[in-house]
Curated annotation (Swiss-Prot):
Its main location: cytoplasm. GO terms for cellular component: cytosol. This is Cytidylate kinase. The keyword Hydrolase does not apply. It is found in: Cytoplasm. Its EC number is 2.7.4.25. One of its GO terms (biological process) is nucleobase-containing small molecule interconversion. The lineage of its organism: Bacteria, Thermotogati, Thermotogota, Thermotogae, Thermotogales. SUPFAM superfamilies: P-loop containing nucleoside triphosphate hydrolases (SSF52540). Pfam families: Cytidylate_kin. Gene3D superfamilies: P-loop containing nucleotide triphosphate hydrolases (3.40.50.300).
Amino acid sequence: MNRFLIAIDGPAGSGKSSVAKLVAQKMNMNYLDTGAMYRAVALYLHSKGLSAKDDLKKHLAEIDIEYIDGELYLNKKKVSDEIRSSEAGKLASDFATIPAVRERLTQIQRHICQNGKFVVEGRDIGTVVLPEADVKIFLTASFKERVRRRFEELKAKNMNLTMEDIADQIKIRDRQDSSRSIAPLKPAEDAIVIDTTSKDINEVADEICQIAFRRIKVEDNCC
């Protein structure tokens, strides 16, 4: 099997990144974080003095994104660390509403995944970017748990935000993601929904791996 795709979708704080990385590791597959791409592009456009109201097509055409040894590079510059700030998340939500931005990044993501085996995580992966994915997972968690996870993540990076700050940010992000006219956040019709509230990442990753192994077996038997 030369190509196999696992799409992992879900709202902020549902565990997408941690789970997707572990699934990729367990299954010896490549890992692709599409949310990181949006953050990188948003910071790049913002650094150019551009906003969501500007004509971005020329600047988007100049963008090249690569994953090298698990690190994200934009136009040959490593950006893996700076994209994890709260500012990057807010900017990403703003720019993600722009059709030209989504079109360009969807094009890049599809190109990266056209050959090989990938675990791809982010918003609208199973519905828009890779509707042909072999396995589609939509992760959920309670609002309280999502806030707690985000707080612990940022605290580990010495970012000084309160639980209230993070709760407000996630509320705004949820509202933007679910109400946007272009690719609103929702599970694909054939996605398997997993509530991660009371599960650790190993439990969730193992569950997804078992789903994937069953799918691989079915596809092998069909060939």
